[in-house]
Amino acid sequence: MLAALVVVYEMRMRSEGLQSVSPQGLIRLMNQGALVLDLRPAEQYQAGHLNGARQMSSEQIVSAGDTLKKHKEKTVVVYDDSGSLGGAAVRQLAAQGFTRVFALRGGLAAWRADNLPLSRA
């Protein structure tokens, strides 16, 4: 079921000209200093998130240009549980002048499926 959702999500992202990244690709981007934004509610973020990720709700993304303006030239990656909010967040950030924005393909579910670690801090 997850695989089917990931395929549908990926097709939608591509048809809209949006970029996504696999969990392994995200690790490379994180090692290069990417800004990672967790779109989930604060309670879910506190229960476990990607190391170094910053919690920012999808509502806050609408005005992220002000909050994150010093990061506009950095690579930014967004994620939620399933990847369903990633496309909208990528579009919002791109509209605000962010030039390298990606969504985590399959969201945190894909990260967990690859048995990758989470932080709880």
Question: Model-predicted segments: where are they?
Answer:
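Rhodanese-like catalytic fold shared by cysteine-dependent sulfurtransferases
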Residues: 1-24, 29-34, 42-75, 81-121
